Amino acid sequence: MTGIIAAAGISLLVSFLLLPPLIRILYRFKFGQEIRDDGPQGHKTKQGTPTMGGIAIIFGTVVGYFGAHAVTMTPPTVSGVLVILLFVGLGCVGFLDDFIKIYKRRSLGLRSGAKMLGQIIVGVGFAIGVTMFPNSYTYTPGSTHLSLLRDFGPPMAVWLFVIWALLLIVATSNAVNLTDGLDGLATGATILSLVAYVIIGNWQLRQSCINALEPNCYTVRDPLDLAVVAAAALGGCIAFLWFNAPPAKIFMGDTGSLALGGLLVGLAITTRTQLLLLVIGGLFVLITASVIIQVGSFRLTGKRVFRMAPLQHHFELKGWAETTIVIRFWIIQGLFVAAAMALFYLEWMPR
């Protein structure tokens, strides 16, 4: 528990102290957000707001994670480091995307194929890595089984698992990216998801098969350290939300959204809760589904289901205030997280 508290506290402090000078530097070099012409007209006032604020989240999280290990005088684990590497790697892809947007003064950065290639390169390294490095109990950071609340079904071939993991990584990182359209929306939703993973990691530690071979135990390699990773990211996101709350003084950009999406899916794979992520990140799923429905409907029928996709912009065009949308969407995400935690606990109880 000391490591969890230390990670969150250090990350929060580092990110909070870093953000004001980062905002000033980004303003000075005119690293501001480019707004799409076809977006909601109210967003025109956000033109030039500093972006790439995800740098502070990433830096704070990394310092918080390794700082917590310094405080507790314990070495980082393979599972924790792999999730951090996925987090930083996808953040680098997002940074390139943001930098191109700023350099070329346009709302679109990396071409979709180039962004996908970057996600695949980082994702393949993570997916292969989690199938390696068994501990003395033969537990690896990840499992080639499918998982919902724990592993189930027969193991997949490693190559098939890599494809499955890539699908999860690309889908989740892009889902968080789509959600990052209103001040504070993606940050708040991610905070709620990270709280879930702090709880899951801590619970799996207490019910680990390493400590007691009981029917309801978990075969997760490094549950405590995964909770530390989640806590470090949680601290960074809370600090960022202070400056990202409406009206935002800084945006996380793709630097932050791709990184946080990668972190969430990395935690899902290593805690053996791959499919539960659909509930823990329920808001991200809803918003992504709205884009799929909108594009599919327009291509098939020539008609749009929503006034605009992603879903948050549909409600903007209906006249909802931005803060109203954000708070109501946070409530929806909170209900998803509560449902996921209930499922997680109820599955454990009967065993």
From Swiss-Prot:
Membrane spanning stretches: 3-23, 51-71, 76-96, 113-133, 152-172, 181-201, 223-243, 250-270, 275-295, 329-349
GO molecular function terms listed in the Swiss-Prot or TrEMBL record: metal ion binding; phospho-N-acetylmuramoyl-pentapeptide-transferase activity; UDP-N-acetylmuramoyl-L-alanyl-D-glutamyl-meso-2,6-diaminopimelyl-D-alanyl-D-alanine:undecaprenyl-phosphate transferase activity
Assigned keywords, A-Z: Cell cycle, Cell division, Cell membrane, Cell shape, Cell wall biogenesis/degradation, Magnesium, Membrane, Metal-binding, Peptidoglycan synthesis, Transferase, Transmembrane, Transmembrane helix
One term under GO cellular component: plasma membrane
Compartments reported by the entry: Cell membrane
Cofactors that this protein relies on: Mg(2+)
Protein's membrane topology: Multi-pass membrane protein
Catalyzed chemical reaction(s): UDP-N-acetyl-alpha-D-muramoyl-L-alanyl-gamma-D-glutamyl-meso-2,6-diaminopimeloyl-D-alanyl-D-alanine + di-trans,octa-cis-undecaprenyl phosphate = di-trans,octa-cis-undecaprenyl diphospho-N-acetyl-alpha-D-muramoyl-L-alanyl-D-glutamyl-meso-2,6-diaminopimeloyl-D-alanyl-D-alanine + UMP
EC number(s) from the headed UniProt entry: 2.7.8.13
A GO biological process held by the record: peptidoglycan biosynthetic process
One Pfam short name: Glycos_transf_4
PANTHER family, sorted: PHOSPHO-N-ACETYLMURAMOYL-PENTAPEPTIDE-TRANSFERASE, PHOSPHO-N-ACETYLMURAMOYL-PENTAPEPTIDE-TRANSFERASE HOMOLOG
Role summary: Catalyzes the initial step of the lipid cycle reactions in the biosynthesis of the cell wall peptidoglycan: transfers peptidoglycan precursor phospho-MurNAc-pentapeptide from UDP-MurNAc-pentapeptide onto the lipid carrier undecaprenyl phosphate, yielding undecaprenyl-pyrophosphoryl-MurNAc-pentapeptide, known as lipid I.
Family: Belongs to the glycosyltransferase 4 family. MraY subfamily.
Protein name: Phospho-N-acetylmuramoyl-pentapeptide-transferase
Gene field: mraY
